[in-house]
Every structure is written in structure tokens, then in C-alpha cells.
Swiss-Prot record:
The chain crosses the membrane at residues 26-46. It holds the Pfam family PsbX. The keyword Membrane applies. Involved in the binding and/or turnover of quinones at the Q(B) site of Photosystem II. This is Photosystem II reaction center X protein. It is a single-pass membrane protein. Belongs to the PsbX family. Type 2 subfamily. GO terms for cellular component: photosystem II; plasma membrane-derived thylakoid membrane. The keyword Amino-acid biosynthesis does not apply. InterPro entries: PSII_PsbX, PSII_PsbX_type_2_subfam.
Amino acid sequence: MLQISNLLLVADVSAQAANNSAVGMIGSFIAAALLIVIPATAFLIFVSQNDSLERTSTGRR
């Protein structure tokens, strides 16, 4: 952690700018989860459940 602090001081980056950047990065991760990961997961679960039902009903005939 000390190395990062020294890097910020040497690069003349303010703590406010570093904080804003970190908040933006976390916000991007949350947005990606909401827009991509969660819908894709729900779709894959839905498809796998339907496939399981189709295989089960086909096997009984």
C-alpha cells in the first residue's frame, strides 16, 4: 500500500482524483454485472431448465 501512495505522490495525482477513479471503476463493475452477467446467467439457467424438461418428457414416451 505504501508503494501505491508513493506512486501517487510522485505522479502528482491528488487523492480526490484517485478516489473518483476508484469509484468510477467500481461503478463500472456494478453496471457490467447488471447489464451483462445477471441477464446472461438468468438466460442460461432458463435454457438449461427447459432442456432438462424436454429430455425428461422425451424419455418417457
